[in-house]
């Protein structure tokens, strides 16, 4: 049941060196720098996104994800979700408007998986970058690198998947689009959606809490993914796997690392889903094909390198 959460809105990442990180996220991925704040954070967006930012970079000594944020339809829905989280037993933290530049107040909570999430209703509307709102051209001609279309999702590793599933489905209004079941029928991976996408956030069982597997950005075509692979080679960027196709979600994809070790994905295509669809199910014994549909063999680095 929809509770008023519309979409993934932003992610804040820790990076070791800001100038090197910007080479990755701006020059290679093609995000646009929109702002900086007095904490030294840098605010980025993809060109089709209408709000001011979707990625925030913060320079620290350890890489990883600080939090992921979801945009809520309005302040009334935000207040109701805050009440629902509190009634469910979640400790919520209030962050005032302006703590993130150009963003309204945020309600932050920690999932049983150990990850921090936040909800907000207001962010400065800047429109799509480089095109007019009336009679817009197909795309801006001065995009850089891979010309990422949008911030799409995060895949996260942590424990307590059943409790995390209950929180996201019962309180926040997500639904289960795809899953992986082990030989006992226990869900070891859950792909949760707010929309018609195969996932807006996904969780994989892992004994450590609060780990980041990757942040993903959408491209339009398979040719764009192949071009991304060319750019990865041209820039001598550390590659993880791909180009290939997933069995899970059926997305066509490539994975690579930022200079701090955070994993990035760019992808195109993939399954669509609706809340009345039965979840797409893969079996853990076939996980090689579920993740790497062509090779059908697991890559240890893909499974174990986390931030």
Swiss-Prot record:
Write down the required cofactor(s).
Fe(2+)
UniProt protein name: Metapyrocatechase
UniProt organism field: Pseudomonas aeruginosa
User: Is Metal-binding a UniProt keyword of this protein?
Assistant: yes
Q: In which pathway does it act?
A: Xenobiotic degradation; toluene degradation
Q: Which residues form the signal peptide?
A: none
Tell me its EC number(s), please: 1.13.11.2
What reaction does this enzyme carry out catalytically?
Answer: catechol + O2 = (2Z,4E)-2-hydroxy-6-oxohexa-2,4-dienoate + H(+)
- Which Gene3D superfamilies does the record cross-reference, listed alphabetically? 2,3-Dihydroxybiphenyl 1,2-Dioxygenase, domain 1 (3.10.180.10)
Q: Name one GO biological process term.
A: toluene catabolic process
What SUPFAM superfamilies does the record point to?
Answer: Glyoxalase/Bleomycin resistance protein/Dihydroxybiphenyl dioxygenase
Q: Where does Fe cation bind?
A: 153, 214, 265
Its assembly, as annotated, is: Homotetramer.
The protein's UniProt keywords, in alphabetical order, are:
Aromatic hydrocarbons catabolism, Dioxygenase, Iron, Metal-binding, Oxidoreductase, Repeat
Among the GO molecular function terms of this UniProt record, one is: catechol 2,3-dioxygenase activity
Give start and end of each VOC domain. Answer: 7-122, 150-269
By sequence similarity, the record places it as follows: Belongs to the extradiol ring-cleavage dioxygenase family.
